[in-house]
UniProtKB/Swiss-Prot annotation:
Residues engaged in binding L-aspartate: 94, 177, 231
Biological process, per Gene Ontology: 'de novo' pyrimidine nucleobase biosynthetic process; 'de novo' UMP biosynthetic process; amino acid metabolic process
Signal peptide (from-to): none
Encoding gene, per UniProt annotation: pyrB
Protein name as it appears in the record: Aspartate carbamoyltransferase catalytic subunit
Keywords: Pyrimidine biosynthesis, Transferase
Length: 318
């Protein structure tokens, strides 16, 4: 990872593929840089010349609106040239392999490739085939590191710290790359994490994660500083993981009554997209506790920071 002053740092090593690779110093550098980037959004001219002449390719093999748009806005605010590459209707849909696509990107001279793929590990393979930096924008059920970074950034903005916070992640942990990235990053930053889910929606290896496991949401909420609700990812399911949606919502949904048991300062987070009425009630999602809209805005600042640090952006960010 390239620091603000150009010094080489450990952790990302030219790429951002997993939060598990980040040291505490790496993570704090991204969050601190994102704070400076956030001030750019408040300026009269919301643009920096730091990546002028650089090319960032958004390579998305899965449909995405918010993440792709967020990376596009981030790169453009740093004055980079942006190429959006969608697998649908492209050579990929005609049978081109990921390696063939990588060779095409290499020929284009891409300085950074932001990759989302349905296969876990695809960005890691891509990073071995291209000379530019690779940013994992979500790979299968594996990781989504910039989402975890923006979540931590949001916690720090609202609560002043991440170290020492009690964070509860609720829902479809089994299929959630967001949960995995958050678990590793939050542990690195000193938070304590509890995951709450039906046994069928917990991964087999969860016992090796730095988390507590609970099946009782009501018992955990009163001791929680941040509760992060996850969507049930039916598109990744080939069988029934719980009896009915109504039963799931009754046991693991955050309704108004449950939210009232949270400490007064506690936050409600959701990486989106939300299924209102299932994992979260509309009144809770739209309440003052909710950071859903802030998370979207903060995503641009965090992704600006990641691109700036990976590509060794020129000039100071005040």
């Amino acid at each position: 990872m390239v620091g603000v002053g150009g010094e080489r740092r450990s952790g990302m090593k030219g790429h951002l593929l997993s939060t598990e690779d980040l040291s505490r110093d790496d993570a704090l550098l991204v969050l601190d840089t994102a704070e400076r980037m956030a001030r750019v959004a408040e300026a009269s001219v919301r643009k920096l010349p730091t990546l002028r002449g650089r090319t960032v390719v958004n390579l998305f093999f899965e449909d995405s609106t918010r993440t792709r748009t967020s990376f596009e806005v981030a790169a453009k605010r740093l004055s980079a040239d942006v190429i959006n590459f969608s697998a649908r209707g492209s050579s990929v849909s005609k049978g081109e392999s990921l390696k063939d696509t990588a060779q095409t990107l290499e020929a284009m001279g891409a300085d950074a490739v932001v990759c989302r793929h349905s296969a876990s590990g695809a960005p890691h393979r891509l990073a071995t085939w291209v000379r530019g930096s690779v940013v994992n924008a979500g790979d299968g059920t594996h990781e989504h590191p910039t989402q975890a970074l923006l979540d931590a950034f949001t916690m720090r903005q609202r609560l002043g710290r991440v170290d020492g916070l009690a964070v509860t992640i609720v829902g479809d942990v089994l299929h959630s790359r967001v949960a995995r990235s958050n678990v590793w990053l939050l542990a690195t930053l000193g938070a304590s994490v509890t995951v709450v889910a039906p046994p069928t929606l917990l991964p087999i290896g969860v016992s090796s994660w730095p988390v507590e496991v609970s099946y009782d949401l009501d018992a955990v909420l009163p001791k929680t500083d941040v509760v992060m609700m996850l969507r049930v990812q039916r598109e990744r399911m080939s069988a029934a993981f719980f009896p009915t949606e109504r039963e799931y919502s009754r046991r693991y949904g955050l309704d108004v009554d449950r939210a009232a048991t949270l400490p007064e300062h506690a936050l409600v987070m959701h990486p989106g997209p939300m299924v209102r009425g299932m994992e979260i009630a509309s009144r809770v999602a739209d309440s003052d506790r909710s950071t859903v809209v802030e998370q979207v805005a903060n995503g641009v600042s965090v992704r600006m920071a990641v691109l700036y640090l990976l590509l060794g952006g020129s000039g100071e960010v005040s």
